Amino acid sequence: MNKTNKFSPEVRERAVRMVQEHRGEYPSLWAAVESIAPKIGCVPQTLLDWVKREEVDSGQRDGLSSSERERLKALEREVKELRRANEILKTASAFFAQAELDRRLKS
């Protein structure tokens, strides 16, 4: 299920940039986020998530980058689909094997 993004990528980038630029003026990252989030109209946790994601994407923080995360999701979907196809093939194989066995027994 896809959710609609309330904030455009430009707004997100600008908000993250504001946090990064003003981070030194606050005692912690959270304090900077709490101060800036109301100015753009989002909750602090959302802005913190954006900042952390940007830090991961730029290599400043450990974790999967956005592109790696998207690739992982695509691979997980593919694995799920392949497993489903494999189950269908197993069922069909068992069906045809039984049909062949029945045919041989009748002959």
From Swiss-Prot:
Gene3D superfamilies tied to this protein: Winged helix-like DNA-binding domain superfamily/Winged helix DNA-binding domain
GO BP term, example: DNA transposition
Pfam families: HTH_Tnp_1
Cysteine pairs bridged by disulfides in the record: none
GO-annotated molecular function: DNA binding; transposase activity
Keywords: Transposable element
Highest taxon above the source species: Bacteria
Recorded family membership: Belongs to the transposase 8 family.
Protein known as: Insertion element IS401 uncharacterized 12.4 kDa protein
Native source species: Burkholderia multivorans (strain ATCC 17616 / 249)
